[in-house]
Amino acid sequence: MEEQDAAKPTSERHVPVLKDRCINLLAPGFEAARKRGERPVAIDATLGMGGHSEAMLQRFPDLHLVGIDRDEEALALAGARLEPFSDRTDLVHAVYDEIEDVLLDLGVPEVHGILMDLGVSSLQLDERERGFAYSYDAPLDMRMDTSRGQTAADVVNNYSEDELVRIIRKWGEEKFAGRIANRIVNARAEKPFATTGELVEQIRSVVPAAAAKSGGHPAKRTFQALRIEVNEELDVLERAVPAAVAATAMGGRIVVMSYHSLEDKIVKSVFQAGSKSSAPLGFPVELEEHKPELKTITKGTEVPTAAEIAENPRAASARLRAVERIKQRRDA
């Protein structure tokens, strides 16, 4: 069965992470819109291959969906998958921190649900030539949008040793960042890096075997760091979560799945800030402008069940947070 599945196109094998749980969390936002006589509108801010969007469109026949992705290949695959719902979808090639501009272009004033499934997609991991995976040799690219921007090869071949230490330590949380950066600089002096295999070989040579046994593949953290740097993932996320909050209608919900602590920290910070009163400490009365915008729906982060991980092993590291808007938008 596994071999047969592996032979199928990625789009056919794709199982959306925590699909039912995400949709159940978003559903009350759509119902709030209906009660006001409005047609519910959702944004899938990280469309990928459209699995979550397809499930939402199937479950909610009145839903209009805006799908956003920076990956043109993913956008094309999702477009084919969502063709039966083409009269209820707008698919946009954009980065998800551009929510405000996307909605402005579409003439959509606000939305009732936003889903963000962060990190690298199944398509990007499975398409070898994209260079996201360390398990096989491929061009050292790692761009989510292959039409623009620097590649991972540009980073490893051109960044100074200090810059490499900084990003590998900060974005990869790699304790051997110094050794790895030094090895990269020495190796590229002889021959510039062109493939993932060449990079993995050099990383293996300096990461102790004992550390690899306890911490997973020795290149895992460095590849994460390079991917984040190439795609400016955390900078985008820092802009995207506030943009999502600003675009969400009263009673609407935002659901975010993150896959490592750096992502979750950003999401948590924005959600917590929006869920607290802004009244000065000791202020006798909470004025309307001081009331929180958001209500936390999940208790901290929710994690996958054993059944959800069995359905999709890539869900294992997922961390889910959800909030609801409980205060009118400033421009509403």
Curated annotation (Swiss-Prot):
GO biological process, one term: rRNA base methylation
Keywords in alphabetical order: Cytoplasm, Methyltransferase, rRNA processing, S-adenosyl-L-methionine, Transferase
InterPro entries the UniProt entry points to: RsmH (IPR002903), SAM-dep_MeTrfase_MraW_recog (IPR023397), SAM-dependent_MTases_sf (IPR029063)
Entry EC no(s): 2.1.1.199
Compartment list: Cytoplasm
Keyword Glycoprotein: no
Catalytic activity field: cytidine(1402) in 16S rRNA + S-adenosyl-L-methionine = N(4)-methylcytidine(1402) in 16S rRNA + S-adenosyl-L-homocysteine + H(+)
Pfam families in UniProt: Methyltransf_5
Any GO CC annotation of this UniProt entry: cytoplasm
Residues that, per the record, bind S-adenosyl-L-methionine: G50, G51, H52, D69, L103, D117, Q124
Gene Ontology MF terms: rRNA (cytosine-N4-)-methyltransferase activity
Function: Specifically methylates the N4 position of cytidine in position 1402 (C1402) of 16S rRNA.
Similarity-based family: Belongs to the methyltransferase superfamily. RsmH family.
PANTHER family attached to this UniProt entry: 12S RRNA N4-METHYLCYTIDINE METHYLTRANSFERASE (PTHR11265:SF0), S-ADENOSYL-METHYLTRANSFERASE MRAW (PTHR11265)
Protein name listed in UniProt: Ribosomal RNA small subunit methyltransferase H
Taxonomic source organism: Paenarthrobacter aurescens (strain TC1)
UniProt lineage: Bacteria, Bacillati, Actinomycetota, Actinomycetes, Micrococcales
